[in-house]
């Protein structure tokens, strides 16, 4: 590494961007690690810089790691390697643990997480989660980019391209507003919902309110009584219930199941019974919420019968 200091710019660029892991002795002085970061940022590729940060993350302070990570945004991103997502996840994990309660640093990290949205999974975008859970402004901004306004605005090619770029990140954003450590406080949730509705009205997109809210509320934690959703979300559903909210909630809840084995309808029958029990527990105090869970239960009952008959026909 010492020899490369004396080389010309082209040689330095070749050295720092080559597909060979950069090695720095564990016995090197602290200033060597900082020098390597600066040189790799100047001459290396996104992947070599990221790999270097991962390798020396325990050799520099968390503040230095934070600063160096933010500076990734200045490097042109090349094709992701097979290890890119792992390196990002590990580096972000350190920074999230240290700075998620620092509003300014959390916002900076959320911006960087968003830049890496095509590589990071949603569960690893903890600062972006916090930003969206605490305030609906950014989520509403994404809605304004992706969906047309109520006045049938003309969509130009530039906006269409932007919508395509951000949609994957929007689609990943599955969260219950204001949820923190498995708890949702009604007053906070209602405030979030009201602000979100106001933003949609200002964007001339009020028609989307029920659909979008239903999609998010399906990610509520379990209530204190052991039934879903939690009490605060039940209260909000009772207050803001619409057919579109119900439909979106049902779809989001059923989509959580993901890929599953076909077993002649046995799994669907169990789900039917589980959702029916949940609905019956809510029926007296939260009729609209119960209606949502009865609908999910009925859907699984029909699917169970269909799978059973199909299995019988195959025999």
Please provide the spans of the model-predicted regions:
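Non-catalytic all-alpha helical scaffold/repeat segments
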Residues: 1-253
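Structural register within alpha-helical repeat arrays
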Residues: 19-20, 212, 271, 278, ...
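Non-globular sequence segments
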Residues: 244-257, 262-263, 312-315
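Inter-repeat boundary and helix-capping residues of tandem alpha-helical solenoids
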Residues: 261, 268-269, 286-287
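Short amphipathic alpha-helical heptad-repeat segments
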Residues: 264-276
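Short, charged/polar, low-complexity loop and linker segments
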Residues: 276-282
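Short, charged, amphipathic alpha-helical segments
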Residues: 289-299
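Amphipathic alpha-helical coiled-coil segments
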Residues: 300-314
């Amino acid at each position: 590494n010492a020899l490369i200091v004396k080389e010309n710019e082209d040689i330095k660029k070749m050295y720092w961007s080559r597909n060979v892991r950069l090695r720095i002795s564990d016995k090197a002085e602290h200033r060597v690690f900082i020098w390597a970061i600066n040189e790799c940022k100047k001459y290396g590729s996104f992947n070599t810089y990221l790999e270097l940060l991962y390798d020396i993350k325990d050799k520099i302070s968390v503040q230095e790691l934070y600063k160096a990570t933010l500076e990734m945004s200045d490097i042109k991103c090349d094709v992701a390697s097979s290890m890119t997502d792992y390196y990002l996840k590990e580096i972000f994990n350190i920074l999230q643990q240290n700075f998620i309660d620092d509003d300014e640093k959390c916002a900076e990290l959320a911006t960087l997480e968003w830049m890496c949205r095509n590589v990071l999974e949603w569960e690893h975008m903890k600062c972006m989660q916090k930003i969206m859970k605490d305030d609906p402004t950014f989520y509403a901004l994404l809605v304004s980019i992706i969906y047309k306004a109520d006045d049938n605005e003309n969509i130009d090619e530039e906006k269409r391209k932007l919508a395509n770029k951000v949609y994957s990140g929007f689609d990943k954003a599955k969260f219950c507003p204001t949820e923190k450590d498995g708890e949702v406080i009604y007053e906070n949730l209602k405030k979030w919902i009201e602000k979100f509705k106001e933003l949609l009205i200002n964007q001339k997109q009020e028609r989307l309110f029920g659909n979008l809210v239903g999609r998010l509320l399906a990610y509520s934690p379990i209530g204190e009584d052991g039934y879903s959703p939690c009490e605060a979300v039940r209260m909000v559903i009772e207050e803001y219930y619409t057919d579109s909210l119900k439909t979106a909630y049902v779809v989001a809840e059923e989509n959580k199941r993901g890929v599953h084995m076909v077993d002649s309808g046995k799994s669907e029958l169990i789900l039917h019974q589980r959702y029916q029990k949940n609905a019956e527990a809510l029926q007296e105090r939260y009729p609209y919420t119960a209606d949502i869970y009865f609908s999910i239960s009925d859907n699984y009952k029909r699917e169970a019968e269909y799978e059973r008959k199909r299995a019988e026909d195959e025999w």
